[in-house]
Amino acid sequence: MKKYNVIVVFEKDLNRTLMCKRTKEPYKGMFNLVGGKIDKENDGLNEAYRELQEETNINCDDISLIYFMNIEYVTMGKSIEVYYGILNKDVCLVEEVNKLEWVDINDNFFDMNKYAGEGNIGHIIEEIKIELNNKNINL
């Protein structure tokens, strides 16, 4: 099974989340979460931090990531590990390939004309909002 990760990054004030604008198909020109492939022998959390550092310049001193959920596409042989975190300070983003953009947390992440993944980004962010509200962290 091929493994991937996606990372939901919230600004410290929780008003915006970080998106990248895809430059390749599938979903070319659409917003997506930061993430990438997980090497088979590597730990998922370490791979999430590695991808985040490579694609944004955000590192473990800037954010603590939480392993939140998996999405599995059994017939496609694909598994996606979902992580999230809240920045503990303002950061200077450095784009690797894809343009990075902060998006208002109240945007419609289910908009399939704007966001990649057939509504998965909306589902992921709504589930994280529930988790944060359960921890008395209000968005």
Give the positions of each predicted feature:
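Short aromatic-enriched loop/helix-cap "lid" or pocket-rim segments at secondary-structure transitions
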Residues: 31-32, 79, 115
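Amphipathic alpha-helical recognition patches that constitute DNA-binding helices
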Residues: 6, 43, 82
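Conserved N-terminal beta-strand and adjoining loop/helix that marks the start
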Residues: 1-18, 34
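A short acidic/glycine-rich loop-to-helix N-cap element
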Residues: 109-113
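Active-site-adjacent beta-strand/loop module that shapes the phosphate/pyrophosphate-binding cleft
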Residues: 3, 13, 69-108, 118-135
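A short coil-to-beta-strand element that immediately follows conserved catalytic motifs
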Residues: 59-69
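Conserved Nudix-box catalytic region and its N-terminal flanking loop in Nudix hydrolases
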Residues: 16-54
